[in-house]
Amino acid sequence: MLWFVVGALFPALLLAAPPPINKLALFPDKSAWCEAKNITQIVGHSGCESKSIQNRACLGQCFSYSVPNTFPQSTESLVHCDSCMPAQSMWEIVTLDCPGNDEIPRVDKLVEKILHCSCQACGKEPSHEGALFNVYLNAEENMPAEGPGPHHYAHHQQEVEEPPASSHHHHEEEGDE
């Protein structure tokens, strides 16, 4: 029975991302770092008025390395890659007014609001598609009959600990899809 459990868990262990590296033996005086920096993000859509919102962007230096291979390979490949990415985020609906468009007078945009960042495996895929779909369904069910105010929906965490202050700008513009 123990061999069955070990045999079932072993492939999952091989596929699991390695933990982030904070120090390297070759550079003992250098450390990885990753933090959420406050920005003003411009949310836009073709034919609509843009809105400025407070958000955060992940910025940092995380370690990656690659050691040359041998053939035939005697050990597993020595390649590692970490990237500064969101560790906690939530989604917010931002409603843009589209004057002069009678068919679509406003557009709702889902914006990822970053709460915290950390060094994580480069190949880590965020599960945004499912989260976006669920957020949109929740928004439709919970949307008041009237009122353009922003609605907050959780992805990983529910509350922003402090409102970000602006010192950097990021512009996001989408055309017709």
UniProtKB/Swiss-Prot annotation:
Region (Disordered): 143-177
Annotated GO MF terms: BMP binding; receptor ligand activity
Stretches assigned to the CTCK domain: 34-123
Localization, UniProt: Secreted
Disulfide bonds: C34-C84, C48-C98, C58-C117, C62-C119, C81-C122
GO cellular component, one term: extracellular space
InterPro entries assigned to the protein according to its UniProt record, in alphabetical order: Cys_knot_C (IPR006207), Cystine-knot_cytokine (IPR029034), DAN (IPR004133), Neuroblast_suppress_tumour_1 (IPR016728)
Signal peptide (residue range): 1-16
Gene Ontology biological process: semicircular canal morphogenesis; sequestering of BMP from receptor via BMP binding
Keyword annotations from UniProtKB, A to Z: Disulfide bond, Secreted, Signal, Tumor suppressor
Location, primary (coarse class): secreted
Function of the molecule: May act as a tumor suppressor.
The family this protein is said to belong to: Belongs to the DAN family.
Protein name as it appears in the record: Neuroblastoma suppressor of tumorigenicity 1
Record organism: Gallus gallus (Chicken)
